[in-house]
Amino acid sequence: QELLLGIGGVRAIKRYVEVSGTPAPEVFHTNEGHAGFLGLERIGDLIGQGLNFDEALQVVRAGTLFTTHTPVPAGIDRFELGMIERYFSTDLLPGVEVDDVASLGAEDYDGGDPAVFNMAVMGLRLAQRANGVSQLHGEVSRGMFGALWSGFDTADVPITSVTNGVHAPTWTDPLMVGLVKERLGHYETSAADWNAPAITDGDLWSTRRAMRDQLVRDARARVKAAWAEENPGVLVPEWMDGLLDPDVLTIGFARRVPTYKRLTLMLHDEARLRALLTDPDRPVQLVIAGKSHPADDAGKALIQRLVQFASAPELRQRIVFLPNYDIAMARLLYPGTDIWLNNPLRPLEACGTSGMKAALNGSLNLSILDGWWNEYYDGENGWAIPTADAAGDEAERDKLEANAMYDLIEHQIAPRFYDRDEQGIPRRWVQSIRHTLSTLSPELSADRMVREYVERLYVPAAHAERVITQQEAYPAKHLAAWKKQVQKEWPNVAVAHVESGGVESPQLGDELEVRAYVQLAGLSPDDVLVEVVFGRARNG
């Protein structure tokens, strides 16, 4: 599959360029290691044009971006080296040697496994630019892949970040679009002035209520349909007509169900959750949707536990699990919830986009500070569940974070939602809705994400690719030869002597004169840059 995606994908693009007359792409963007073999196909083409492997590698690197989407090593594809031998010892890529391929994915660093081929490592070595998909994920990725840049401080590992975004026209409810069109005269919800007097608190609140009502009606229909399918010929129970309430604080949770997402964290204290759901004055209702991988038995067990809890007669109208989670369901679920819940184990959420889709519709987030929420939470657009990652064990961490979540719902979220004026409008809540729509809508859209990729990564990559291929790729040939020379001589390069002076007891702001005598072996002074790190020495 990965050969088909990477090599076949580039061949398909080349064929399309051929038949359509479209200019050939200058920049290639590899999303995760799965498509990493695209770089090898491009190297093969360049070898066919007269470059050697190392020279072709410089050209490919210049015009390639690699994006990692996983924050854990277990999420990376790794194969036995024998598979590389099997596929690349053929004529699949003429001129590309097996050893050269193997070297790109080799875990030849501290902590690596020399017996495997790592697709992400290959992707990083084939790309001059790399990024994670949120600021926190970029930080995690610099730590996870830091061994590839031996001697670098983690902060200096060359992996940046571009936070994901979502397609606003797809995920913004037509009722919100209609409100903007009616009051402001345009359809651009992400660029709307949500503080404009033309959009009143009553407008916002009635629209939010209508979207909640849509969700309730859809959930009832789905639950009834599922019942009828499982119980043919049996009347649908009357209680399903009262499933959920369009006037009750609604919390949504929907996504895949790997264990790190902690679907059942909300069940940590069942008695406390039951009290929140059945509170006579400030009730809460939960709408949960998701699906587990067919082979994920742990995920299936989480769903079964949740369904069992929700089947209790006193709870079944306040908590519902919607099976067969799909886009049609999601497009009503995100806008219809007042609160979007996300409680992964930090920092295992690379970015997450479900909360973004909810926020585009004025829903507020209740989330662990992970993924995108870590950088966008500002205290007014929702609530942050404190992270207990310093807890002694997983059970203690779950307990602390679950209790914090219950506290936020009971003491902050529900009181704000149900605090109504004489017109029945929760003014403070609507203020948070306005703030969320004003500040997050432009930032969470795919428009912002694409603009950031273009300006920060694609344009520089295209420029680098043009420069390195000038004069029949002379810069690539020169760079490859220079790297080879540096690698050959580097073991003999050493700092022979360092002198410092000018200040006996240096203080912050003082100037310190440093002179270093460096043994350059076969390199010239133009080949190196000498840097000074100043600080307290660490023994050992």
Features from the language model and the residues they span:
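Catalytic cores of carbohydrate-active enzymes across secretory and cytosolic contexts
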Residues: 1-540
